[in-house]
């Protein structure tokens, strides 16, 4: 799978995957510990790119946070954002602010997300060039 190869090239080997079984779409979330540095974990959706969001490219979401945050909660949050995008066929573009219906995780005050390029990582990470369409990796 070209997406997995792309992710592992820039983020290292996938430590684990979390399937979001309570969701309507076939999505999972990949976990990359100590990326981009020690004490931080990076998460990526897998499967969002199968859905047309009414844009020239397809998407997989990237989220980076403290390794202390609960992985299952982050996976549920990311799959929820992905479901919203799929349901509304809405692309997620750089510079947008996404207002959330609640905080990301219990104990956090974060209830909105800013969409940016994945600036923590190598510039070439932000796009995976495919045969039929490109996949972009916005950082939330």
Regions picked out by a protein language model, each given a short descriptive name:
Residues 1-140:
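Acidic, proline/glycine-rich low-complexity IDRs
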């Amino acid at each position: 799978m070209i997406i997995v190869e792309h992710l592992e090239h820039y983020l290292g080997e996938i430590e684990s995957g979390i399937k979001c079984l309570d969701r309507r779409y076939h999505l999972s979330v990949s976990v990359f510990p100590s990326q981009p540095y020690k004490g931080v974990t990076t998460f990526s959706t897998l499967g969002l790119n199968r859905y047309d969001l009414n844009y020239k490219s397809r998407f997989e979401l990237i989220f980076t946070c403290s390794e202390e945050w609960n992985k299952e909660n982050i996976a549920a949050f990311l799959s929820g954002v992905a479901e919203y995008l799929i349901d509304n066929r809405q692309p997620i573009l750089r510079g947008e602010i996404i207002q959330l219906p609640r905080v990301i995780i219990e104990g956090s005050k974060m209830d909105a997300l800013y969409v940016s390029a994945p600036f923590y990582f190598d510039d070439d990470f932000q796009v995976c060039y495919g045969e039929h369409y490109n996949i972009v990796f916005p950082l939330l």
